[in-house]
Amino acid sequence: MSVDVIDLRNFYSQRLGVVARRLINRGIRAHWPDAQGQRVLGIGYPTPYLGLFREDAERCLALMPAVQGVLKWPTARPTLAALVDERELPLPDSAVDRILLIHALEMSDDPGDLLREVWRVLAPSGRMIAVIPNRRGLWVRTDNTPFGFGRPYSRSQVTQLLRETWFTPVGWTEALYMPPVKRGWVLRSAVVWEFASTTSGFRDACRSSFLSRFAIAFLSAPLPARSSISGAHSDRAGVW
């Protein structure tokens, strides 16, 4: 089940969405400190996150699936976003150096086809990050965020899917330990939740993961015990 692009935009304009974006951005930045001279592509609804790279990257594009819809991005500049068929991306082979998947894999009717297209347009030794809901996480148990829609994954399921689509798992990172509630005190303490969970026993209970032809993927944090994933192709790696 896909989420409409208007609902995605509305989520990220709310306080809970702002906090989620900030926490996920921290994880993305940890793996990709910069994108100087790189060709960066976002698939799904990546625009809240592509701002990390738009100024430094050689080129930065957003492709949004037809079933979801598309919004102009960036709003005050020439558009860099397009509506596409996710099974036939309008790019030549090895066209980009880095790909960010978010609100994409879990929403896809055929995630295998999507990842094969990602592999095709990703340059050898390119990198992918996939943000994926953890099937045992708190965030998939409520429909007040986009992470509660579509098909969530376990670490083993993502590992298998990556291997079937020519990526080899290589590592993972965690994010979104805080519960997905809109209470002010929870939102204000979001960074504390992240820090405490990565330095305590909650590490295995609540986690997310990053994927990289090198792929990097991360899942939204789980309940006890949750997991994340990383993946890599023989010449293109993935982290999750």
Feature roles, as predicted:
Residues 1-34:
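Class I SAM-dependent methyltransferase Rossmann-like catalytic core
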Residues 26, 31-89:
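Class I SAM-dependent methyltransferase SAM/SAH-binding core
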Residues 99-100:
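Hydrophobic beta-strand segment of the Class I
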Residues 112-127:
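A short glycine-rich, Lys/Arg-flanked "PGG" loop and its adjoining helix->strand segment in the class I
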Residues 127-152:
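Conserved class I S-adenosyl-L-methionine
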Residues 148-172, 176:
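Short alpha-helix
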Residues 170-196, 205-206:
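Conserved catalytic loop of SAM-dependent methyltransferase domains
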